Amino acid sequence: MATNYCDEFERNPTRNPRTGRTIKRGGPVFRALERECSDGAARVFPAAAVRGAAAARAASPRVAAASPCPEFARDPTRNPRTGRPIKRGGPVFRALERECADYGGASPRRVSPARAFPNRRVSPARRQSPAEAAEASPCPEFARDPTRNPRTGRTIKRGGPTYRALEAECADYGRLSPIRSPWSDWSSTGLSPFRSHMRKSPARRSPARRSPARRSLARYTEHLTSDSETEVDYDARNVIRSQVGPGGVCERFAADPTRNPVTGSPLSRNDPLYTDLMEICKGYPDTPLTKSLTGEGTDDDTCEAFCRDPTRNPVTGQKMRRNGIEYQMFAEECDCSGISRPSGVSRTSGTSGSSGSSASSRPPNSFEAPGASSRPPNSFEASGAARVPGTPSVSRGEPRWMSSISTRHNYDESNPMSVAFRLRHVKDIRKFLRTVRPGRSGFCATDKGGWLGSAAVSDNVIGQGSWGSVHMVKFRDFPEEFVVKEAVLMSVSEKHRYKPTVVWDEWAAGSVPDEVVVNNMVTEIAATGMTPFVPLTAGAGACDSCNPQLLEKAAKVTKCYLQAMEAADFSLDRVLPTMSPDQAASALAQILLGLQSLQTTLGIMHNDIKAHNILVKRVPPGGYWKVTDSFNGQVFYIPNEGYLCMLADYGVVRLVKPAVGMDTLYGTRNARFVPRDVGRWGKGAGTEYVVTPIRSKISVVVRGGRFVGVEPNKAVRYWKNTDTSKVGDVITTNNVFYMGYDIEPDMQVQLDDTNSFPVWESRGDVADCVRTFVGGKRASQPGFHRLFYKKTGSAWEKAAETVAKQNPLFSGFTLDGSGLKYIRAATACAYIFPGMAVPRPGEREIESFTM
């Protein structure tokens, strides 16, 4: 064969020099040409054809100049001979890697520096000095910018193969890799050492979650305990307390040990990260809280303060989550069985009502004006029936609402339409159920051979929902029927806190489901004369293994709880199609005023108002209920059209009032409303208030009702002079308040006063109340309200449609106060029903209430 063929084949080994056709590298034609041209002085691929022929390659300057190794070292993602992309770890990559094993440049191989080429022989001419090697190392550039490959300059994916190879190669550079380096700015890059990645478990060879936080914390611990000042030239505590959210890690962990101080996710006491944080932050700050966390004990004054107000940390004054780590710690160390809360003690401050509350005694970020917490608490706030720690059973004996009914001046059990008569009935139900023994699985309604099957004479399912069912039951030894609602324990925390109930309505400490607590509060609100438009409950019990009858869902055996309540004749969806306009008007007014009483006392966000969740009782028609709004002195006269409507189902509620102590979200407060006149009616409803918009500097990001982070407040809200005018010149911010975060408002906001500082999220509940009658989209849940009611075009229906068509972004932002009808249920009632300002002639008063 002519030499020119070999030269041509050497220049372009991808084509046959005789035919000009493309040939496959490694194929039969390629191998034949390789053998044919291997006898001459010109070698095609000495490193590929003759393995290890370094001397021959060095002897041929022309071939050495055409070596692919320099280009391969610069860019290992492309074949230096063809220019085509190659897969890292593929056959071509491995062939080039073997061919360039003796190349003196940086190798693209992904191996640890400690194990890279242990038996490699390096030519003396190619040996580098330590200074040259340090200068050629990619580690300094990788430490400065870990998002780029220092050899190619291309962007690399954090955690990808190239990144991990460089991380392994530079493991000893600066003692820490860039992702966990103390000089990396976590706040600017958005990264955190408290991130988890999936790794292979060496023992099981299966994906197992490991916590890089523990490794990084262990490294920081070495620096914290090091005696050498030359090895570490920075303060590692400042690294731990880097600006990730408001405050440092140790400050946030000391303030709330129940949550990860960086991510905000719940943190268990058994979590290894909790142990590491305790070890690192045990000396910072040096406060009684950290002393108690590290096991140095709790003094008597601290226990006394905790027993007086178990909703606040007695050391820091901040809110404590019920059954959280701090709560359990103080409950275990403090015996509160012999300590009773004195009269006039406020739950918000833990001080006596007679002694003024100073600004220094208030917990940080409470946003309350001085003296706001010194007022006497409402009965439902001070009761704490289901939240008093340190006792073996939190509901032993009679609930607090039983003692509340006897204190009312108009307490009359002889009138079947009075709340007192209804309370006496549920009291008898509770007393009877406490004598009934539980079944094998506890107080169950649907388990095999369950409690109801053996004790009840009749059991009829009258309603089904997504998470439970409602039964109308009749017991052998009780004269009347009543309702039992079986609900599934949904939240993980409730399942974790679950403990069986041996006696009806007698719960172990910390095991009461949230809905049971809310129902007890609602019953107490009715018992204290605030509203008759809510259902009354008679206690609850737990079930180990129920088989609930759910709506459109396959039932599984799980843990449940049962609640007993007074019987109703039907839900609103059954009777609404046959209601007259006067009956529907009375029903809507009852629901709105019942909602207002809950907004005032609990700061409730119901989130599930619909016709199916409104219970209706038949009552003899005639008379009226007198309801007084204590905020503006407005008096409503609700005519009795033969139906008593009760707002029920509190399974997904949120209670944003801090004094209640059941939520970390305190709601959106965008203005202060101060009444300057008695409440007005019709189109003038709400204009009796002086409106002062609120601005804040910090925005708390809440998605899905959960805290995400904080950022500068840039959420703009435009205010109008009236509800029908155009947008004015007043521009403010959207102000979301969250427990423990100071959003820096421009005025003192009393979060417990939901009348002066209404919760903007209440617009959804008001809209759902009205849309239940006039139709429309559900505000708090997916779907639409089915139009059961047959509209007639009456005046109140047109006013209700105005409220129902509110804009969720702009409605309510009016300087004259007319937009309050979208937020406050009582103002909406005054706008829709101006005729209820006076009673009907000749009608008698059934009962009076003040909300």
Curated annotation (Swiss-Prot):
Positions contributing to ATP binding: 462-470, 485
Active site as annotated: 608 (proton acceptor)
Q: Which family does it belong to?
A: Belongs to the protein kinase superfamily. Ser/Thr protein kinase family.
In the UniProt record, does the keyword Nucleotide-binding occur?
A: yes
EC no.? 2.7.11.1
Query: This protein is called what?
Result: Putative serine/threonine-protein kinase 019R
The first-level EC class reads transferase
Q: What chemistry does it catalyse, as a reaction equation?
A: L-seryl-[protein] + ATP = O-phospho-L-seryl-[protein] + ADP + H(+); L-threonyl-[protein] + ATP = O-phospho-L-threonyl-[protein] + ADP + H(+)
Q: Which GO terms describe its molecular function?
A: ATP binding; protein serine kinase activity; protein serine/threonine kinase activity
Q: Does the keyword 4Fe-4S apply?
A: no
Q: Where is the composition biased (Low complexity)?
A: 125-141, 340-366
Cite the entry's keywords alphabetically: ATP-binding, Kinase, Nucleotide-binding, Serine/threonine-protein kinase, Transferase
